[in-house]
Amino acid sequence: MKTKLNELIEFPCVFTYKVMGEAKPELVDLVVEVVQRHAPGDYTPQIKPSSKGNYHSVSITITATHIEQVETLYEELGNIDIVRMVL
């Protein structure tokens, strides 16, 4: 029997996205812009460069209110051109 994500998470809850993308100045702004559309708030993302400096990881934490919000953010963050992966 498969357990669905929404059966494991009780909403509202704190949810952190880790977005890895090219080390371009606009990465953080693009991530925050997408998050603001679905979970408006005051965000201070954490940015960490890769060892060679080609990529940055942007961690941003929201208060998720429902599973559709979580899934939509995964999809839209992944659709940003310079993003390579969303965890």
UniProtKB/Swiss-Prot annotation:
<dbReference type="InterPro" id="IPR007454">
    <property type="entry name" value="UPF0250_YbeD-like"/>
</dbReference>
<dbReference type="Pfam" id="PF04359">
    <property type="entry name" value="DUF493"/>
</dbReference>
<dbReference type="GO" id="GO:0005829">
    <property type="term" value="C:cytosol"/>
</dbReference>
<comment type="similarity">
    <text>Belongs to the UPF0250 family.</text>
</comment>
<protein>
    <recommendedName>
        <fullName>UPF0250 protein ECA1299</fullName>
    </recommendedName>
</protein>
<dbReference type="InterPro" id="IPR027471">
    <property type="entry name" value="YbeD-like_sf"/>
</dbReference>
